[in-house]
């Protein structure tokens, strides 16, 4: 399944034909933005049909530049409708989409460009102005500039009317020969990079078809007109999660950035039904003083993933936003939805006073096989900890141009995730921790996530990370790095240590607590423990 198939199939099924002019005139500022793609930062709307037209014209531009099926084309732009235009054009010609996160460093994105062998770059003018050396590195001839309502210097209105210079009017039939083989690569996604330099996971047509099948089964179209809000980076899960709502005929509301007051206002004003946010962004919403003043009755799926979430903050989110929270577990190598914690699961946890359900990431998703393996590859029974491994058509094809790294995580048909987990008797999977994050102190194995979950529940704590630091006596000393909600408040190191001792015992309790103004985070909001470890460790093998 190509990405453009989500758009084309939706149009064919639902006949979304709303006109931009009518929506621009009648819908702007009102609660219903209409059916299509609405860019709130650039004040522009494209109906589904207009998006098809624009993508056809841009695909023709790419063809003129010599782009062939399976060539790699990157988008380096903030969230925008223009970025969606580029994505669908890339897909329509059968090329491979590589999204680059604007919050990455330039060096990190240049490494991804070089790893992938990018042939054409869609580049936002704001990025070009910030990094003029990028053009010298990549070449102006193979760069297409976009900004706001313009791509390649042309307004959307011109593209809709098929007035691309030297291309002329192009119809959909011109692109029926683009690659649709189930094993053809559709997109490349950078791995988290939280434990080292990012690799590129290849998602095939079959991967995307499976993502679609799973997501439609787990999160069917709502009972009211759908609006999906994209505010977290399109280059990662928030963007990837938007394609099934597109297939279901949802309006896509696009903003760049996660300012709490603005997001909450958009949810109310535009009657948002779906959104995806990482836990760190949800914490910001919950901390906003006026969070309870807005109307969230339109929400059907408030999707969170990408990192563990505090149980206490999750309970608060359910209280404020309603019974709409859903969670998935996945990674770039096994994308989006290996497991699913449904709305009903969240409610069951509250009704039965069973916080272990909220600490889990749900049950195994349809079309996915999942097992807990020991170090020798043997499957472990329920309630025993081991490494999570997965099978199924959801998996990536492999790491781009890195067969050795692909082979290293695959064994007897299973793909190892690098995550330690345990499956309970009811089928709920709990992520214990990253295998590499485990602390060995005094001969005991300690998983930081258990300690972090406890500290997160303390009223004064905004966020925390627990790591092992070198210690002559214990080998590694359990250390908590803490962000306070109020940076001006008086830190209580001994209070945190004693609280953890009372709940977890002396082995797992931190031996020291350090208070930082801000934890280092990746562009998608994950705490970068490798950066924290650099402060304490000199051994390069442990800085992962």
Where do the protein language model's features map onto the residues?
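Conserved pre-ATP/AMP-binding loop-to-beta segment of ANL
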Residues: 161-190, 197, 220-227, 366
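Conserved AMP-binding/adenylate-forming
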Residues: 44, 59-104, 445, 483-484
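Conserved ATP/PPi-binding loop(s) of AMP-dependent carboxylate-activating enzymes
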Residues: 363-367, 376-408, 446
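Conserved AMP-binding A3 loop
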Residues: 45-49, 186-210
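Gly/Ser/Thr-rich phosphate-binding loop
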Residues: 247, 273-276, 286-355, 369
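Conserved AMP-binding/adenylation subdomain of ANL enzymes
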Residues: 209-227, 235-274, 288
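AMP-dependent adenylate-forming
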Residues: 5-47
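AMP-binding/adenylate-forming catalytic core of the ANL superfamily
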Residues: 104, 121, 267, 275, ...
